[in-house]
């Protein structure tokens, strides 16, 4: 139960019981619950979308996006923005890249990337409602993205002392594969297009390894955001295919 509470606290801003003591090392155990927290996020997002869809797809999309950002506290968006600044300003210098990641200021690369990301999600959420992607797909989608983050932590951490280092090399593989099997079974039944999620996982992991040689907390957050958007795009496209 402690690790579940920590996972909810780490990945969301939802209220949870307060732990009397805390050890940063406990975060490593929380990683087994990432997919479950993703389902919780997805359920809240889909619920608000369902309410808004009674009036208009755009209203549903806006409610879902606002809920998504609020529930997560913009945690993963922050990672995406930091990574965009780092990649844009580092000029392939590892030292410069890490320095930019630690800089609390927001640069132009981050602003542009975050604006495009939010706009893409808003439009794709509207299209998902309009074309009947299905609320179950929206519930499952954040879980797939967060389970991907578990796999990305098999990469070496880029720097010592960050959240990513606490997760690296400390994997509960039985929990990972159980989560994968459950998500795969639900997706095969409710939203088959989401079974392509591991392809997006692999693409992001390959990018991190080839471009950066490892991962950081910002890399994990950015990957979650991009996986969510990628799966939204795939889900919308699937509704327009002849076999959909």
UniProtKB/Swiss-Prot annotation:
Signal peptide span: none
E.C. code: 2.7.8.26
GO cellular component: plasma membrane
Reactions this protein catalyses: alpha-ribazole + adenosylcob(III)inamide-GDP = adenosylcob(III)alamin + GMP + H(+); alpha-ribazole 5'-phosphate + adenosylcob(III)inamide-GDP = adenosylcob(III)alamin 5'-phosphate + GMP + H(+)
GO molecular function terms noted in the UniProt entry: adenosylcobinamide-GDP ribazoletransferase activity; cobalamin 5'-phosphate synthase activity
One Pfam match: CobS
Transmembrane segment boundaries: 33-53, 57-77, 109-129, 132-152, 176-196
Compartments in which it is found: Cell inner membrane
Presence of keyword Repressor: no
InterPro entries to which the protein is assigned, alphabetical: CobS (IPR003805)
Names of required cofactors: Mg(2+)
Topology versus the membrane: Multi-pass membrane protein
Pathway: Cofactor biosynthesis; adenosylcobalamin biosynthesis; adenosylcobalamin from cob(II)yrinate a,c-diamide: step 7/7
GO biological process: cobalamin biosynthetic process
Domain of life, per lineage: Bacteria
Free-text function comment from the UniProt entry: Joins adenosylcobinamide-GDP and alpha-ribazole to generate adenosylcobalamin (Ado-cobalamin). Also synthesizes adenosylcobalamin 5'-phosphate from adenosylcobinamide-GDP and alpha-ribazole 5'-phosphate.
UniProt name for this protein: Adenosylcobinamide-GDP ribazoletransferase
Species, as recorded: Laribacter hongkongensis (strain HLHK9)
Gene responsible for this protein: cobS
